């Protein structure tokens, strides 16, 4: 039999088993049970106090102590301790045995490695060597006899349950103790057919009789079933206990499933149960919480404790982890991914006829949108015009819809439409609840259930799950849950076993700070000439590979008391550990009593971390090449997911070296990596800053050299193609792995040509070994506000005459989600004005005067005439990591949640606005501004006796504008006159 592995799971009882859920070519499910063993690695000579189930000789391993020892005298540098020992792997049924080596690795990873199993692989199995237990469930005692060979991946049909519920409520958020469920909409996708249906509660519809009286009378073929809430809950109990491959919800683990389970217990004293495929264990549905701390907030995820092989997948938690959005409500996510362009074909009073074709959209975008349109009831035109759909005509490459809208539009105009929030107020609907409203709500509910599948398909979640499972050697149900420090353990254990190396530590890990990447100060604020951008390719991974930065390759760490001692010690240590066999790097000291430290790495044999990185980079290249030749959709989606997973994990290695809780923790390796990275970007800056292209010669600012040996590689003067013109180069900024080089021309075509020549010269004459740079782009009209904040017009590296540039805002207020739309528009306008005045060669004093004059006029006009509040909305993320338990932000949300049904959850962004009494005149002095904050939800409107507190917004805008200008005197006078204070000027 040919099978595809789709999930692995364990039972909850004391006698542990591993279960494989597999699907054969006929899309039938089989379960295979394996004995669960705990794995312990010992020296072969060690006498055990217990009799293990099995001992496996691993052979000789190099045991390396990777504790970092500090030396203060070069004469007494201690060599790294290691020895070779014969090891044995013990498999035992009991946990918590004494462990000697490799204790931090997961038992399931050992299972995969020892049996040479890929978690998501396809295999030819010999069913004769399996022992039948129950129908479609077998026990396996000998994996090698059952799993005959791995075969190419084949497609199987998964089964799905997607559902959404609506609960009756009045003012507050629904309570499981008080509020009944009014609707449950489901989409069941089976091997052969699909069912879309809704259960409607007749207990709250007195004029409607139930269509069934018992849950056994239910048929999923009926589009709508009317029944009592108890019957509805018993139907869902049976459905949820069924062994689907996936149960997909949006925040269902926290709300929908919890609510159904709670109502079932309250009304019927019944519970949802899950059973193992071998029927040896049954568990009651429980929801457990897992906390993930990151940044400024703690994120909580919810998980179902099932044991039946079903993957309960919460799209809400998945998207929170993978996307950076203003809001993680279903309508916001839908709006973000399901959108297209339409042309207005006809306007008949309030009815708009909209047409979408391949002329204004890609085929993929149109196809995805059309699919969602099948169940959609409302679309959003532009940012906020929610319009009801009254007619649909969906074709293969186009669609026509008619919507109701009171807004003014022009025939022929093109607009972006999206699936956002349906324009329904559930609270009002329940207030006037009847059969007609119940049916209207049903359309809303079934659409939300279907949206889960559309989002699932859009993100290609199964492909991502399988790619992660295969790469990290984890069960599919866990592959997307863990953090990088756990995910790396599978590939690392595999490599350690292959290389026959084991790391040990005797000293407790100590966390020290270290300096990160080099960020140059901007040389000035604005640039009229073009700026070329050059990036190092995978700088940190390549630094680790070249320097052989791996904990077992660390030779010594020498502390220096002062600069003179540092220089003397460096000369001595380089003679003792010569390049290229070794690399000696001077870094900042980890101890405050010392001036610096010299770290030495042995490059003679490749270390574990460089091998790990080369494997990840090589695998990514392999899958990118396979992606180009993929012949089926399943292959292309899998290879794309795999290359992406390998990119992510390769980039995470450097971070894990500096993370004390990681298996890969190596403080010296992380610090040396960033030090070499800073040296590489500084070296490139020294070569390019002041270089000149004179006709057919390039005169560099310094001699190209090997930064590790100091050896000069080429002359400063290099031959280049004759441009019959001279160009000067000046470094104006740099950040970690990229350098911004200004060229003395405004001609895009010439700049692109020269930059490509420079890329080749830098890679062949200036850099060496595996270090390479790439010409990324040309920036024109660059405004460098400060470190990591700039605005520019960007031309791509492969520029051809006629290509249109794009505007780029990086780190500026235009890209920040906590900045008001009005602020963004104003800053963009004044940056455009600044560049225009610079191109006109106006003087700095004149530029400052004109901009401040215009800014004051605009602010006075806005203060006098505006009543639109939407463009003044700000947003922030709700979290509970404030130092004070009564922080004003937290209290603001707390008060809002007490009064509103749509609660703001931890980790979610919300909008707020500053408003004050309309009678309040212009306020020069702003005090206690937090007291003027009001949360602005979808129903918010500006009260007649209030005005926007413009002064708060204007002061922030003015602060940013004056930091773009050079005449500080004019700026201070302007600020004092309008706001009664001096502006704060940026120091970088």
Swiss-Prot record:
This is DNA polymerase. GO terms for molecular function: DNA binding; DNA-directed DNA polymerase activity; nucleotide binding. InterPro entries: DNA-dir_DNA_pol_B, DNA-dir_DNA_pol_B_CS, DNA-dir_DNA_pol_B_exonuc, DNA-dir_DNA_pol_B_multi_dom, DNA-dir_DNA_pol_B_vir_insert, DNA/RNA_pol_sf, DNA_pol_palm_dom_sf, DNA_pol_type-B. It is an enzyme of class 2 (transferase). Keywords: DNA replication, DNA-binding, DNA-directed DNA polymerase, Nucleotidyltransferase, Transferase, Viral DNA replication. Belongs to the DNA polymerase type-B family. Pfam families: DNA_pol_B, DNA_pol_B_3, DNA_pol_B_exo1, DNAP_B_exo_N. SMART domains: POLBc. It catalyses: DNA(n) + a 2'-deoxyribonucleoside 5'-triphosphate = DNA(n+1) + diphosphate. Catalyzes DNA synthesis. Acquires processivity by associating with a heterodimeric processivity factor comprised of the viral A20 and D4 proteins, thereby forming the DNA polymerase holoenzyme. Displays 3'- to 5' exonuclease activity. Might participate in viral DNA recombination. Does not perform translesion synthesis across an abasic site. Its EC number is 2.7.7.7. One of its GO terms (biological process) is DNA replication. It comes from the Viruses. Interacts with A20. Component of the Uracil-DNA glycosylase(UDG)-A20-polymerase complex; A20 and UDG form a heterodimeric processivity factor that associates with E9 to form the processive polymerase holoenzyme. Signal peptide: none annotated. It comes from Fowlpox virus (strain NVSL) (FPV).
């Amino acid at each position: 039999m040919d099978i595809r592995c789709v999930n692995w799971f364990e039972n909850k009882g004391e006698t542990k088993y591993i279960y494989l859920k597999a699907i054969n070519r006929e899309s039938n499910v089989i379960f295979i049970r394996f004995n669960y063993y705990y794995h312990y690695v010992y020296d072969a000579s060690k006498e055990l106090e217990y009799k293990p189930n099995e001992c496996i000789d691993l052979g000789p391993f190099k045991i390396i102590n990777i504790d970092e020892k500090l030396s203060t005298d070069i004469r007494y540098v201690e060599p790294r301790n290691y020895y070779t020992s014969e090891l044995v792997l013990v498999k035992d049924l009991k946990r918590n045995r004494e462990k000697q080596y490799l204790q931090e690795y997961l038992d399931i990873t050992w299972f995969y490695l020892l049996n040479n199993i890929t978690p998501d692989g396809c295999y030819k199995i010999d069913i004769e060597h399996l022992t039948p237990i129950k129908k479609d469930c077998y026990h396996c005692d000998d994996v090698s006899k059952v799993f005959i060979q791995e075969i190419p991946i084949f497609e199987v049909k998964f089964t799905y349950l997607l559902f959404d519920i609506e609960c009756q409520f009045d003012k507050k958020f629904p309570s499981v103790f008080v509020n009944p469920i009014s609707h449950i909409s489901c989409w069941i996708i089976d091997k052969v057919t699909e069912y879309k249906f809704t259960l409607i509660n007749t207990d709250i519809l007195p004029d409607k009789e139930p269509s069934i009286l018992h849950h056994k009378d239910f048929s999923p073929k009926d589009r709508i079933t009317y029944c009592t809430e108890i019957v509805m809950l018993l139907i869902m109990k049976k459905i949820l206990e069924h062994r689907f491959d996936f149960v997909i919800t949006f925040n269902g683990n926290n709300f929908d499933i919890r609510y159904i389970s709670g109502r079932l217990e309250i009304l019927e004293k019944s519970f949802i149960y899950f059973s193992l495929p071998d029927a040896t264990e049954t568990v009651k549905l429980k929801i457990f919480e897992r906390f993930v701390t990151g940044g400024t907030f703690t994120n909580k995820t919810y998980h179902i404790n099932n044991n039946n092989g079903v993957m309960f997948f919460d799209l809400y938690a998945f998207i929170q982890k993978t996307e950076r959005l203003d809001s993680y409500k279903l309508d916001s996510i839908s709006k973000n991914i399901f959108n297209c362009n339409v042309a207005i074909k006809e306007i008949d009073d309030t009815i708009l006829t909209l047409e979408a074709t391949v002329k204004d959209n890609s085929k993929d975008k149109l196809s995805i949108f059309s699919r969602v349109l099948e169940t959609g009831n409302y679309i959003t035109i532009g940012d906020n015009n929610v319009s009801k759909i009254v007619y649909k005509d969906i074709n293969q490459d186009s669609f026509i819809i008619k919507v109701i809208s009171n807004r003014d539009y022009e025939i022929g105009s093109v607009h972006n439409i999206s699936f956002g929030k349906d324009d329904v107020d559930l609270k009002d609907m329940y207030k006037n609840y009847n059969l007609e409203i119940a049916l209207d709500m049903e359309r809303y509910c079934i659409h939300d259930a279907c949206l889960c599948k559309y989002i699932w398909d859009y993100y290609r979640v199964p492909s991502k799950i399988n790619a992660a499972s295969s790469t990290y050697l984890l069960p599919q149900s866990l592959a997307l849950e863990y953090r990088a420090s756990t995910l790396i353990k599978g590939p690392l254990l595999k490599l350690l076993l292959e290389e026959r190396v084991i790391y040990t530590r005797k000293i407790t890990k100590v966390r020290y700070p270290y300096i990160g990447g080099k960020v140059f100060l901007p040389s000035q604020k604005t640039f009229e000439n073009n700026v070329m951008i050059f990036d190092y390719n995978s700088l940190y991974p390549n630094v680790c590979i070249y320097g052989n930065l791996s904990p077992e390759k660390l030779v010594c760490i020498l502390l220096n008391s002062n600069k003179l001692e540092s220089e003397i010690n460096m000369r001595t240590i380089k003679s003792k550990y010569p390049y290229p066999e070794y690399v000696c790097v001077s870094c900042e000291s980890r101890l405050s009593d010392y001036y610096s430290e010299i770290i030495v790495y042995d490059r003679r044999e490749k270390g574990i971390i460089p091998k790990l990185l080369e494997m990840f980079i090589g695998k990514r290249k392999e899958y990118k090449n396979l992606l180009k030749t993929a012949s089926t959709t399943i292959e292309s989606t899998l290879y794309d997911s795999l290359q992406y997973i390998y990119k992510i994990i390769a980039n995470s290695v450097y971070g894990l070296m500096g993370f004390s809780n990681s298996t890969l923790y190596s403080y010296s390796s992380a610090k040396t990596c960033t030090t070499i990275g800073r040296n590489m970007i500084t070296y490139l800056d020294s070569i390019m800053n002041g270089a000149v292209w004179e006709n057919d010669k390039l005169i560099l600012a310094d001699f190209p050299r090997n930064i590790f040996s100091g050896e000069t590689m080429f002359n400063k003067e290099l031959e280049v193609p004759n441009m019959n013109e001279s160009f000067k180069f000046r470094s104006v900024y740099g950040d970690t792995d990229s350098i911004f080089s200004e060229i003395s021309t405004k001609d895009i075509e010439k700049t692109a040509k020269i930059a490509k020549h420079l890329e080749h010269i830098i890679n062949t004459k200036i850099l060496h070994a595996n270090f390479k740079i790439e010409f990324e782009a040309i920036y024109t009209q660059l405004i460098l506000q400060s470190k990591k904040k700039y605005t520019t017009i960007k031309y791509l590296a492969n520029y051809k005459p006629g290509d249109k540039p794009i505007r780029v805002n990086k780190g500026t207020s235009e890209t920040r989600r906590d900045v008001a739309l009005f602020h963004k528009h104003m800053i963009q306008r004044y940056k455009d004005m600044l560049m225009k005045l610079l191109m006109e060669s106006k003087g700095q004093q004149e530029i400052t005067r004109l901009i401040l004059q215009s800014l004051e006029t605009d602010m006075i006009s806005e203060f006098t005439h505006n009543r639109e509040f939407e463009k003044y909305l700000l947003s922030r993320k709700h979290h509970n990591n404030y130092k004070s338990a009564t922080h004003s932000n937290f209290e603001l949300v707390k008060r809002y949640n007490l009064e509103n049904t749509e609660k703001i959850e931890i980790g979610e962004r919300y909008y707020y606005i500053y408003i004050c009494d309309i009678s309040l005149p212009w306020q020069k002095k702003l005090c206690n501004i937090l007291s003027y904050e009001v949360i602005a939800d979808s129903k918010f409107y500006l009260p007649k006796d209030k005005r926007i507190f413009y002064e708060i917004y204007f002061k922030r805008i003015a602060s940013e504008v004056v930091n773009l200008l050079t005449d500080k005197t004019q700026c201070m006078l302007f600020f004092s006159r309008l706001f009664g204070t001096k502006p704060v000027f940026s120091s970088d």
